[in-house]
């Protein structure tokens, strides 16, 4: 899912940059001759963790536009663009949210919704999706993305990411402390402060733990996808269009689909890789929709 990948990647980058800057400014100071100040570290981790997640959320829309080259439709130049605008407007009214920006970008069949607030979101679809699906199926995809916005998934995920970030920042520094103590235990000139071992370990652990923690975010995302599918069915008055859209996408390239298809839940990754998948298997999604009939 493109919006999830962008959010997580941006979040990891923001946290890494914040850590480096704060360390250079001397704010990252929890170690003294008395040892590691855990309460102070926890407060610091909470502030950095949630600040990083919030910054990632606030810049999610411009980042998505930039990374995909999405062109926001301000004045429809074709009947397809006019239909897209009209469809999103109708779906948004049914969902009770303000009209999102609508964008189109070149690429494989894909779609995403992003934005910091329900009433200032962005819904984007690829040219590949428009070319490979019927209008009924495209409308189902649009309904799915509008449901994400109406459900407040980006904001909710920010809270989840903030909690995850807190643990990542906290644990990275605890590990850094013990590694640094081990490296400097024979240094008679050590004054109990932070050494190079601490700095390097924290930076490495932060990236590694951040990637590992994305498993939690992915698990959360998979559960939100079922809600978005159900939301699309409610907006359209029937689960059939969404089922058709998923089936269509599943048949575009059986068993071997490009990474870009992740946003529509087609990348049914086996084994260990499934832990990092932001979407449940397409068969499970269709089965869940079928149970609504």
Swiss-Prot record:
Keyword Metal-binding on entry: yes
EC number: 3.4.24.-
BP-aspect Gene Ontology terms: proteolysis
S-S bridge residues: none
InterPro entries registered for this protein in UniProt: HtpX_protease (IPR050083), Pept_M48_protease_HtpX (IPR022919), Peptidase_M48 (IPR001915)
Cofactor binding mode and count: Binds 1 zinc ion per subunit.
Membrane topology: Multi-pass membrane protein
Hydrolase keyword on record: yes
Active site residues of this protein: 145
Transmembrane spans: 4-24, 39-59, 159-179, 200-220
Keywords recorded for this protein, A-Z: Cell inner membrane, Cell membrane, Hydrolase, Membrane, Metal-binding, Metalloprotease, Protease, Transmembrane, Transmembrane helix, Zinc
Cofactor(s) the protein requires to work: Zn(2+)
GO cellular component terms, semicolon-separated: plasma membrane
Binding residues for Zn(2+): 144, 148, 225
Localization in the cell: Cell inner membrane
UniProt enzyme class: hydrolase
Entry GO MF terms: metalloendopeptidase activity; zinc ion binding
Signal sequence, renumbered to the chain: none
Entry-linked PANTHER family: PROTEASE HTPX
Family the UniProt entry places it in: Belongs to the peptidase M48B family.
Descriptive protein name: Protease HtpX homolog
Organism from which the protein derives: Herminiimonas arsenicoxydans
Gene name tied to this protein: htpX
């Amino acid at each position: 899912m493109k919006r999830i990948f962008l959010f997580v990647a941006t979040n990891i980058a923001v946290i890494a940059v914040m850590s480096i800057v704060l360390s250079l400014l001397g704010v990252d100071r929890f170690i003294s001759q008395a040892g590691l100040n855990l309460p102070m570290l926890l407060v610091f981790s909470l502030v950095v963790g949630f600040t990083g997640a919030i910054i990632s959320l606030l810049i999610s829309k411009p980042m998505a536009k930039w990374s995909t080259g999405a062109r926001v439709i301000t004045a429809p130049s074709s009947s397809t663009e006019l239909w897209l605008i009209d469809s999103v407007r109708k779906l948004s009214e049914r969902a009770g949210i303000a009209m999102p920006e609508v964008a189109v970008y070149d690429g494989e069949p894909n779609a995403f919704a992003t934005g910091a607030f329900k009433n200032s979101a962005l819904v984007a679809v690829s040219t590949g999706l428009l070319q490979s699906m019927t209008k009924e199926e495209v409308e189902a995809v649009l309904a799915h993305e509008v449901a994400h916005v109406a459900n407040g998934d980006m904001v909710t995920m920010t809270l989840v990411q903030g909690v995850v970030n807190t643990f990542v920042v906290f644990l990275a520094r605890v590990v850094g402390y013990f590694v640094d103590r081990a490296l400097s235990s024979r240094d008679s000139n050590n004054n109990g402060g932070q050494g190079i071992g601490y700095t390097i370990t924290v930076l490495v652990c932060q990236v590694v733990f951040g990637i590992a923690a994305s498993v939690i975010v992915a698990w959360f995302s998979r559960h939100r996808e079922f809600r978005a599918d159900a939301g699309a069915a409610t907006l359209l008055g029937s689960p059939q269009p969404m089922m058709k859209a998923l089936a269509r996408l599943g048949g575009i390239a059986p068993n071997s689909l490009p990474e870009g298809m992740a946003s529509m839940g087609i990348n049914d990754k086996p084994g260990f890789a499934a832990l990092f998948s932001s979407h449940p298997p397409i068969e499970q999604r269709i089965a869940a929709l079928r149970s609504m009939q």
